[in-house]
Curated annotation (Swiss-Prot):
Its cofactor is pyridoxal 5'-phosphate. It catalyses: L-aspartate + 2-oxoglutarate = oxaloacetate + L-glutamate; L-2-aminoadipate + 2-oxoglutarate = 2-oxoadipate + L-glutamate. It is an enzyme of class 2 (transferase). The keyword Transcription regulation does not apply. It comes from Rhizobium meliloti (strain 1021) (Ensifer meliloti). Keywords: Aminotransferase, Cytoplasm, Pyridoxal phosphate, Transferase. The gene is aatB. The modification N6-(pyridoxal phosphate)lysine is found at residue 249. This is Aspartate aminotransferase.
Length: 410
C-alpha cells in the first residue's frame, strides 16, 4: 500500500505564529476604494502612507549613474560601506549620535529593520510595549516573532503620547522592548525632549528593557517643533537603543525600499544573521540612490514640509468645523487622527446605525466616496486617520463631502 493511498490530502494550514494576523483594515479599505474607482465612482483616497512628491532628480540621477557603472551585483549583506558612511554622517550631523560602521545596518525598508530586530531578540512570550495608536505592522511583527505585544492606550487627553506612569505600570520581568514612534503614524503626535525625559528615567531604572525608536518622519515636523531622538538625550541608554530611520518619507523614496538603523554592535550583528537568511542585501541601485539622498542638498525638505503644513491646517480646520468630529493638531508626519465619538449612535440615510469608527468610515466610503482608515486599525477607537499627502484641491473636496455626509446623519 502506498503512502498516497493511506494519507488523505489536507488543505493548507497556516502556521500558528500567523494565526492571529488577519488582512489589514487599511488593505481592505484600499481594495474596496480601488474597486469603486474601477466602476467609475469618483472616490477620493486619503489612506496613502506616502508623500505625493517625486523623488529628487539628483537622487534618480545617482541611481542611473550606478546602473551605468555596473553597480548591479550583490553588495555587503547589511549595507555598502558608502551608504553606511553616509548614515553615520547623518546621525552625527542631525542627531549628535556617533556610531561605528559595524553599529549601523541597512535593510529593505524600515519594516525589515523592525522585523530583524524582533526576530533576533525575542523568545516566545517576551513582551514588547507598544503605545496605541500604532502603525499596524508593529504588533503583527511581534506576533510573527512569537513575542507578546503589550498595548497601552494613549488617547487624545495625553496627546496620543505614552506617559511615564503608564510605562512604569506596563513593565514586567518579561518586557524586552518599548517601541516608540515620533512623529507618529497614525496620530502625527511627536515627543519633545520634555516628553521623552520622564520615559527615559523609567527605562534607566529597568536595565533589562531595550528601546526601539522609529524616527521615519523626523523631517516632517511643524510650527517650529524641535525633533529629538532618545539616544541623543540620554547617553546612558544608547547601548540598549535601536534608532530606526529611512529615506522613504523625507525623500519621497517609498518604492526604493531602504531603511537603516544605528544600535549596539551585538544587536546589529544578530540582525545581520536574520537578514542573511531572509532577503540578503538590499538593492544595490537603491543604496546608491540613498547615498545621494543623505549626502546631497537638503534645502528642498523645508519647502515640502511647508506644503504639508498648509495641508495639515486645511484638514484640521475643516474637520473641526464638522459637528461630531474633533481633531487634534498634529506636530508632524502627514496624518490627522480625528475623534468621531460625536457621530456614534447616529443613523445613515439608508437606516443603518453607526456603532463604531469602522461603521463611520464605511459610510464615508459608500456615501461620500471618501476613503479614510478607522482608528480600530491602529488599536484605538473611535477615531479615523486621514493622510493629507495629496493635493489641496482633493482635500477641500473631501472635506466638503465628509461635512455633507455628516449632515445627512440623523
Amino acid at each position: 500500500m502506498t503512502i498516497n493511498a493511506t494519507v488523505k490530502e489536507a488543505g493548507f494550514q497556516p502556521a500558528s505564529r500567523i494565526s492571529s494576523i488577519g488582512v489589514s483594515e487599511i488593505l481592505k479599505i484600499g481594495a474596496r476604494a480601488a474597486a469603486m474607482k474601477r466602476e467609475g465612482k469618483p472616490v477620493i483616497i486619503l489612506g496613502a502612507g506616502e508623500p505625493d512628491f517625486d523623488t529628487p532628480e539628483h537622487v534618480k540621477q545617482a541611481a542611473s549613474d550606478a546602473i551605468h557603472r555596473g553597480e548591479t551585483k550583490y553588495t555587503a549583506l547589511d549595507g555598502t560601506p558608502e551608504l553606511k558612511k553616509a548614515i553615520r554622517e547623518k546621525f552625527q550631523r542631525e542627531n549628535g549620535l556617533a556610531y561605528e560602521l559595524d553599529e549601523i545596518t541597512v535593510a529593505t525598508g524600515a519594516k525589515q529593520i523592525l522585523f530583524n530586530a524582533m526576530m533576533a531578540s525575542l523568545d516566545p512570550g517576551d513582551e514588547v510595549i507598544i503605545p496605541t495608536p500604532y502603525w499596524t505592522s508593529y504588533s503583527d511583527i511581534v506576533h510573527i516573532c512569537e513575542g507578546k505585544p503589550v498595548l497601552i492606550a494613549c488617547d487624545a487627553s495625553s496627546g496620543f503620547r505614552l506617559t511615564a506612569e503608564k510605562l512604569e505600570a506596563a513593565i514586567t520581568p518579561r518586557t524586552r522592548w518599548v517601541l516608540l514612534n515620533s512623529p507618529s503614524n497614525p496620530s502625527g503626535a511627536a515627543y519633545s525632549a520634555a516628553d521623552y525625559r520622564p520615559l527615559l528615567e523609567v527605562l534607566l531604572r529597568h536595565p533589562h528593557v531595550w528601546l526601539l525608536v522609529d524616527d521615519m518622519y523626523e523631517h516632517i515636523v511643524y510650527d517650529g517643533f524641535r525633533f529629538v531622538t532618545p539616544a541623543q538625550l540620554e547617553p546612558g541608554l544608547k547601548n540598549r537603543t535601536l534608532t530606526v530611520n529611512g529615506v522613504s518619507k523625507a525623500y519621497a523614496m517609498t518604492g526604493w525600499r531602504i531603511g537603516y538603523a544605528g544600535g549596539p554592535r551585538e544587536l546589529i550583528k544578530a540582525m545581520a544573521v536574520v537578514q542573511s537568511q531572509a532577503t540578503s542585501c538590499p538593492s544595490s541601485i537603491s543604496q546608491a540612490a540613498s547615498v545621494a539622498a543623505l549626502n546631497g542638498p537638503q534645502d528642498f525638505l523645508k519647502e515640502r514640509t511647508e506644503s504639508f503644513q498648509r495641508r495639515r491646517d486645511l484638514v484640521v480646520n475643516g474637520l473641526n468645523a464638522i459637528d461630531g468630529l474633533d481633531c487634534r493638531v498634529p506636530e508632524g508626519a502627514f496624518y490627522t487622527f480625528s475623534g468621531c465619538a460625536g457621530v456614534l449612535g447616529k443613523v445613515t440615510p439608508s437606516g443603518k446605525r453607526i456603532k463604531t469608527d469602522t461603521d463611520f468610515c464605511a459610510y464615508l466610503l459608500e456615501d461620500a466616496h471618501v476613503a479614510v482608515v478607522p482608528g480600530s486599525a491602529f488599536g484605538l477607537s473611535p477615531f479615523f486617520r486621514i493622510s493629507y499627502a495629496t493635493s489641496e484641491a482633493e482635500l477641500k473636496e473631501a472635506l466638503e463631502r465628509i461635512a455633507a455626509a455628516c449632515d445627512r446623519l440623523s
